[in-house]
Amino acid sequence: AFNFYYEENLQLLRARGAELLFFSPLANDPVPEDVDGLYIGGGFPEEFAEKLASNEVSKQSIKAMIEKGVPTVAECGGFMYLTKSIETTEGMSYPMVGVIDGKVAMQSTLAALGYREIFGMNDNFLMKEGEVAKGHEFHYSIFQPNSLYPPAYELKSRFGAKRVGCILHSLIAGYVHFHFASNSKLVDNWINACLQFQEQKRNAI
């Protein structure tokens, strides 16, 4: 359900000293213990919506981690999973993690496709104001928010610009897939946020 990651992203995270631990919401796994960061990538959660909806261990574990302030990046399918629900093209609605106040509705036609320039906004932990990276969008769903969130970035393409992405706690979530090799500063930013979270945990003991 969440199997799309640019391999360069994982390589760059490892090169900066990150230890990557894997778990599967489809298998109802909890988030590995004592993590300092969380990465939920893209995929097709709508194809596994019923199974994901029933896997409460994974959903509650992820929600708890985000609410604790674990620096989290969620891209496309991962973003969809963190909303309150996914509605299929058949009109069936399945409850998801529920951290983001809104739902996702699937369409039979593409909602977005193509490469994007990404401009950081609101000095979020991943992209500071003025930092630029590249990535892409590819999705058939639309997000219908119930609450307003500060936009994490501005996307520019040949069709124009839009301010999107959600900032919530230490969560950056949206449809765009980041390509960290386009600006490795994003990796440094994320690693630093994870180290700060790790230090906060130590100080709380």
For each feature predicted by the language model, list its residue ranges.
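Short, glycine-/Ser/Thr-/acidic-enriched flexible segments
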Residues: 1-2, 27-28, 43-46, 79-80, ...
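Phosphate-binding active sites in nucleotide-utilizing proteins
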Residues: 2-55, 60-65
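Conserved active-site and cofactor/substrate-binding residues in soluble primary-metabolism enzymes
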Residues: 4, 8-11, 15, 57, ...
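Generic hydrophobic alpha-helical scaffold/packing signal
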Residues: 10, 14, 39, 49, ...
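Glycine-rich, charged/polar anion/phosphate-binding loops
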Residues: 21-27, 82-84, 119-123, 158-161
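Structural motif
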Residues: 39-41, 73, 175
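Cysteine-nucleophile active-site neighborhood
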Residues: 45-124
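Amide-donor transfer/coupling interface in amidating biosynthetic enzymes
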Residues: 106-205
